[in-house]
Amino acid sequence: MKSWWPKALKVRRAEGQPVIPDVASASTPARFRGKPKIDFSRCPDGCAACVEVCPTGAISANPLTIDLGACIFCPVCTETCPEGAIAYTNDYKMAATSREDLLLREGCEITPEACSREIRRLFGRSLKLRSVSAGGCNGCELELNALGNVNFDMGRFGIEFIASPRHADAIVISGTTTQAMAHALEATFEAVPKPKLIILFGACAISGGIFQDSDQLARDFIEKHRVDLYIPGCPPHPLTFIHGLLEYLRKSDPAPAAGAQLLPAVSPSLWNLTPLKSPPC
């Protein structure tokens, strides 16, 4: 019987490094539809072709604006525009800390603002997430599940999903937030100890997506609670989530006051810890 490991080593060598070392400079496939790019010079006055065909009403005219919180990243607008003014790039960096920042218009850049120094002190090195699927199609949930695989390995940043909301620091909401999930969503959020964060993952969670006009939605939770981070997409790419969350947690705040005590930077040596010995019985 031939040994399996020579073939396994050959395959491993051909595949290369599976983990993405730097999520800020990672590249996505050319076919990936990321942040749209608008050439405003090619958009004629009075043309509303893209507005009329958008299935979620994410595009508005005068001035031309694309709402990434409602966009499902379908190619209909790019195929319909007679001047080719709209095109998708493979840029996955689209997370934002306010709903208004998801409005893509001329002269606007999308970038998460820094969290408060207290949030960074508490969660900068360890952030536990509780996922709540509030009426999703499982597309977003599949991408959230991929965050823990060998490629993205979100755990190396101290960020991971856990089962109990009582041990969580934030909830990640995917899906449209239906009436059937309204009570469960509220109860889960109440179980998370303070301070806590809310992250909306995907177009359905942010705006209702293609189901925004359904009478089965219950958006009261989104309207009455402050959302800390928006992750657009349908579904969002795992890199969009990781990059947006790291930008939110690790961006530098303005210079601290004299004598202020700040959390020191994480030393790489801290990750090379030796396992503890088992205590005697």
Regions found by a protein language model. Name each.
Residues I38, C47-M94:
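Iron-sulfur cluster-binding cysteine motifs and their immediate structural context
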